[in-house]
Amino acid sequence: MGFRFLDIVKPFTSLVPEVGQPDRKIPFREKVLWTAICLFIFLVCSQIPLYGIRSTDSSDPFYWAKVIMASNRGTLMELGISPIVTSGMVMQLLAGAKLIEIDQSVKADRDLFSAAQKLFGMLICVGQGVAYIWSGSYGDPAVLGFGNCFLIVLQLFFAGIIVMLLDELLQKGYGIGSGISLFIATNICETIVWKTFSPTTVSVGKGTEFEGAVIALFHLLLTRNDKVRALKEAFYRQNLPNITNLLATVLIFMVVIYFQGFRVDLPVKSTRVSGQQGTYPIKLFYTSNIPIILQSALVSNLYFISQLLYRRFPDNILVNLFGAWRTSEYSQQMIPVSGLTYYISSPNNMSAVLADPFHALFYITFMLTSCALFSKVWIEVSGSSARDVAKQLKDQQMTMKGHRDTSVIKELNRYIPTAAAFGGLCIGALTVVADFMGAIGSGTGILLAVTIIYQYFETFVKEQQELSGGIGGLF
């Protein structure tokens, strides 16, 4: 039996900023404009440096999740979408486990639950800000002083609120999609383009090379006498983006888009209008990119906690079992070398897989299991289970052809849980393959980018269908 946690939140709802529901139907062009404005605000905040910091040269605790969490080191977007994703994940899982009692059919409960998510997200902003300072990410806290430390946390707090409001603005229908998806896709695509065409030079043992894979290819071919060796280096150079990584990225993009088309169309008909028929599609990626977002949020927080503990207690046995870390000579970032965090981190390439096959096997098992479980749990807590879909069809005066209302749930249960679990499994498998192939932007990043871009494509198509009306617009 759950407790009325939402009643505890009620007195604080007046402190939570909220975007009101639109009082009219927003035209599609206006939605595009608001989406562009939200993206512009996010990109500007990603370039404004935090006031009061002394240094950002130290290892970044969230280095592993920077691209996925749409964050930018040393700026207002230091935390990115991490607070809102973490708060949403925790609250949804608590509601799904019935530890928080909520009736989704009651508007007051839905509003309180949304306010509770925001409050928790605001607390996470403060907590992560304090943890960043305590870890010395911006310099020695004693040197920074209380005033600067307070200002840094305050800036991160208000930046977190801005992200929440931008996300809510889009989700309430003023724009297209969600802020979280928009910011993730933008950050990942920016990273892929930069690592492909970056003109930045990097000093390596053989001299100076360009960071961008394509730029480096032409540079090596033009400056090296041995063209075959130059081509080989451009394809297989270590610790910098290479052409093989780029080709792997393109391949994964194409495979994910191909799998997006896999679906089962269930025939439905209207119980009100005779002869009106349509289909209800159940996709292979039924929960879309949610499993990988939740898995990334879980892992990034585990990394964060592990690094903080290891910096303070490097000789503690339990801390070392959780994760031991060292500084990479190439990126100057902390990387896990043993413990739980090491085994749930991805091997960088096939050489690393062959060097430690147990690590690779553990990582594969962890990714596949966690993505499948998160996908299964998500359909229950997000209102997309067989029972919820059957209720939606009934509310729209629709039913499945050849089935009575009482047997619709049973028929949907044949497809939805399987699609959720198997779809999550496929998402995890594609992520693992992309990681092992060394795809640019990480396997997780590419999966997120492709699924988000595909969602936007579907949204554009749906908008066109709604203009023409009919049953096709419902599904």
UniProtKB/Swiss-Prot annotation:
Short name of any one Pfam family annotated for the protein: Plug_translocon
Assigned keywords, A-Z: Endoplasmic reticulum, Membrane, Protein transport, Translocation, Transmembrane, Transmembrane helix, Transport
PROSITE patterns: SECY_1, SECY_2
Membrane-related topology note: Multi-pass membrane protein
GO molecular function: protein transmembrane transporter activity; protein-transporting ATPase activity; ribosome binding; signal sequence binding
One example of a Gene Ontology biological process annotation: SRP-dependent cotranslational protein targeting to membrane, translocation
Ranges that cross the membrane: 33-53, 76-96, 119-139, 146-166, 174-194, 242-262, 290-310, 354-374, 412-434, 441-461
GO cellular component: endoplasmic reticulum; Sec61 translocon complex
UniProt entry tagged with the keyword Transmembrane helix: yes
Compartments where found: Endoplasmic reticulum membrane
Cytoplasmic side of membrane: 1-32, 97-118, 167-173, 263-289, 375-411, 462-475
Tagged with keyword Kinase: no
InterPro entries, per database record: SecY/SEC61-alpha, SecY_CS, SecY_dom_sf, Translocon_Sec61/SecY_plug_dom
Parts of the chain on the Lumenal side: 54-75, 140-145, 195-241, 311-353, 435-440
PANTHER family: SECY/SEC61-ALPHA FAMILY MEMBER
Described purpose of this protein according to its UniProt entry: Appears to play a crucial role in the insertion of secretory and membrane polypeptides into the ER. It is required for assembly of membrane and secretory proteins. Found to be tightly associated with membrane-bound ribosomes, either directly or through adaptor proteins.
Similarity comment text for this entry: Belongs to the SecY/SEC61-alpha family.
Subunit structure: Heterotrimeric complex composed of SEC61-alpha, SEC61-beta and SEC61-gamma.
Name of the protein: Protein transport protein Sec61 subunit alpha
